[in-house]
Amino acid sequence: RVLPEKTNHFVIEQISSEHGKDVFEIAISENGKIVLRGNNELSVAMAFNRYLRDVAHVSYDWFSVSPLQIKGELPLPISTIRMACSAQERFFNNTCTFGYTFPFWNWERWEKFIDWLAMNGVNRPLMLAGQEKVWLNVWQSFGLKKEDIQAYFSGPAHLPWHRMANLDKWGGPLPVSYIEGQYRLQKKILARCRELSMKPVLPAFAGHVPEQLKQVY
């Protein structure tokens, strides 16, 4: 997805982890191709990113024009490059980031972002989208009305603070179309993360319940 026109310049090989930690190598094959080695998909993505940065001198971020455009032959590494991760768990994101632009991203934006996460070695991304679908189902199973639950939720840009039990209803009610759309999007996000050997961090119950629950219990 990042450099599709140059895929025939690369060879992917699997190697063992180093003392239980992710490791990658960049080398040259006998027929002059660029070899990216890693102990899993994430490590290969890291090798690819390091090749782009240190050998091809090209940077990629989630705002980059994708795919990248590199004219001519790709440069070869002078010697084998090997790197091992110093930490087993590499976490990224925080609760509040899901109230900035994340609530309004489509799949195309998320796909680029997830590629960037993998290329930079993140294996424990916090992924909080779509959880309102779960809570909607839970509160309905307790006998609450859908309209009351929608009014309890905050609007998209304020959901992080609602999820932390700081506020209710602000900027709401939350449309069912948004709840369903974020749920579908989250399933695609999680599937892609797992394809790239990530283990996404998901939310648990924070103890925050709708006021209307008092009318039922």
Regions from the language model: what does each represent?
Residues V2, Q14-S17, K33-R37, E41, ...:
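Aromatic-lined carbohydrate-binding surfaces of glycoside hydrolases
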Residues G20-V23, V35-L36, A45:
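N-terminal helix-rich structural modules
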Residues L3-P4, H57:
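Residue-level recognition of short, structured coil/turn motifs
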Residues E5, F10, I15-S29, E73:
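N-terminal regions that are enriched for targeting/export leaders
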Residues T7-V11, Y60-S64, L128:
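Surface-exposed patches in mature extracellular/periplasmic domains of secreted proteins
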Residues L42-V55:
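Short active-site loop/helix that positions an aromatic residue
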